Amino acid sequence: MMSPLHSSWRTGLLLLLLFSVAVRESWQTEEKTCDLVGEKGKESEKELALLKRLTPLFNKSFESTVGQSPDMYSYVFRVCREAGNHSSGAGLVQINKSNGKETVVGRFNETQIFNGSNWIMLIYKGGDEYDNHCGREQRRAVVMISCNRHTLADNFNPVSEERGKVQDCFYLFEMDSSLACSPEISHLSVGSILLVTLASLVAVYIIGGFLYQRLVVGAKGMEQFPHLAFWQDLGNLVADGCDFVCRSKPRNVPAAYRGVGDDQLGEESEERDDHLLPM
């Protein structure tokens, strides 16, 4: 007959085994993400901010095919996610279309990232080693993400492969994304600033004058409007000013003729009409 102590020991061991399996499964199902180059916990704040900026692209996959058979290759790229089929941390892979061979160009567990005003450079290191080039160093992928405010992410294309050097070889890719754009800063023009200032002054004048007329002077009705008499006569003042500026001759222009007074008329002789009378 099995002792209670032995049975309890077996139960505890079984529970520990089940717990270990559960932890391992959770680790396997947890999706990996970018690991910046450098000591853990001492990553650059700027690099971490840039990776967070690219978060909307984490669930997207980008593919581009180049060449012609039998030298046709397909490149698959993902941001901080597995792009290959072997869970090797590959962020960018090259697939030979003729035989299906997959080559890891760069892994996201060795990531570098930096940016400029309208671009972001994402670098994956730690790819598969070259066979006969670049001193057999590991491959490296450089993805240039340029600003395009009209798309979240598009136009992923390989540009070139630099492998004519002894070291520091790389694959260069490009793509467009609005995430690489700097925030738009709206600037007010000089005219807009003047209009805002003028509107503010007018509002202060009307409100302040209204309160003064009502509370201090004790005005009622239309008389509460500041300088009411001036504004009522403004039309006449403008008309007078326009007349003064625009008229082309003086107001009191001397007449081109003068009237003749009665004293200047001589007495006409009536004799010159006598012959017209009937005889």
Swiss-Prot record:
Gene3D superfamilies: Mannose-6-phosphate receptor binding domain (2.70.130.10). The keyword Glycoprotein applies. Residues 258-279 are annotated as: Disordered. The keyword Ligase does not apply. Residues 32-183 form the MRH domain. Glycans are attached at N59, N85, N96, N109, N115. The chain crosses the membrane at residues 188-213. Residues 214-279 are cytoplasmic. Its main location: membrane. Keywords: Disulfide bond, Glycoprotein, Lysosome, Membrane, Phosphoprotein, Receptor, Signal, Transmembrane, Transmembrane helix, Transport. PROSITE patterns: MRH. It is found in: Lysosome membrane. Disulfide bonds join C34-C80, C134-C169, C147-C181. One of its GO terms (cellular component) is trans-Golgi network. Residues 29-187 are lumenal. Transport of phosphorylated lysosomal enzymes from the Golgi complex and the cell surface to lysosomes. Lysosomal enzymes bearing phosphomannosyl residues bind specifically to mannose-6-phosphate receptors in the Golgi apparatus and the resulting receptor-ligand complex is transported to an acidic prelyosomal compartment where the low pH mediates the dissociation of the complex. This is Cation-dependent mannose-6-phosphate receptor. It comes from Bos taurus (Bovine).
